[in-house]
């Protein structure tokens, strides 16, 4: 840590605190995520390990936040990321009204390019939401927080937990307890994010899992085996029943959105996961090629995080770890292959 000067605190996540820092020799500004180990014998938290591995698999995309270095520190380790000025949640929060159509197109296009790159490399993010889409000082959107990401098994035989994704962006199959799923969970989240950008507020703001399903059903209608044959195989399908609800036309939900925008949105928000439009296909949709065209990143709003140079922390878990410990990190805790030295650019 001696090579960095801490400039302020950005926020707190599930496994550590994120700081804004400057490299002493190069002057480069970075974001340092300090990950503490509660007990040395527990080893590296799975989420932190997944984030490292996923980012090393897809480090060549300009639409994914770059992991610059990983190094041990005290009873834990530190991830050094490129510094990003804000996030899409702040953009939506600061907007006085829904974003302009050209701005929505630009953000969505950058998001889809990042998602397409991840999926092409068999990475499923599993927690796409505006707060995990960071914005650089130049307006570039990049996907961050790969703590829930997994390498996708194309044969579909692998079981995963359904307790992933932030509730408002959680796909219906996850709400019904699916243990086998694929990139479709990310595509549903993209649709939720697109709807939020068009609407200026979340499409499905449920306060618990049951209410979340109700929010979805109110707009998309009650799912049936006729529309979604696989629903009967989901673990929680028979645990709760809903009265028949007809879908509400998306043009009534988002009356100011264009026909092309609603057509693309509808292809994300489909009950059968395999029928959702792929990110690579979505980038070819007519929506992106009709006026107004996507805005240049320099034309996009870039709000500062609250607090200016010392941004307000995002809500985190009640426990706060002490990172200022002098105990050496046992070699067995950290795979040496995951440790990369800081290499200054240029």
Swiss-Prot record:
GO terms for biological process: cell division; embryonic brain development; embryonic camera-type eye development; embryonic skeletal system development; floor plate formation; negative regulation of smoothened signaling pathway; neural tube closure; protein localization to cilium. ATP binds at residues 10-18, 33. The active site is at residue 127. Pfam families: Pkinase (PF00069). It is found in: Nucleus; Cytoplasm; Cell projection, Cilium. Residues 298-324 are annotated as: Disordered. Residues 4-288 form the Protein kinase domain. One of its GO terms (molecular function) is protein serine/threonine kinase activity. Residues 303-318 have a biased composition (Pro residues). Keywords: ATP-binding, Cell cycle, Cell division, Cell projection, Cilium, Cytoplasm, Developmental protein, Kinase, Nucleotide-binding, Nucleus, Serine/threonine-protein kinase, Transferase. InterPro entries: CDK, CDK20-like_STKc, Kinase-like_dom_sf, Prot_kinase_dom, Protein_kinase_ATP_BS, Ser/Thr_kinase_AS. Its EC number is 2.7.11.22. Monomer. Interacts with TBC1D32 and MAK. This is Cyclin-dependent kinase 20. It comes from Rattus norvegicus.
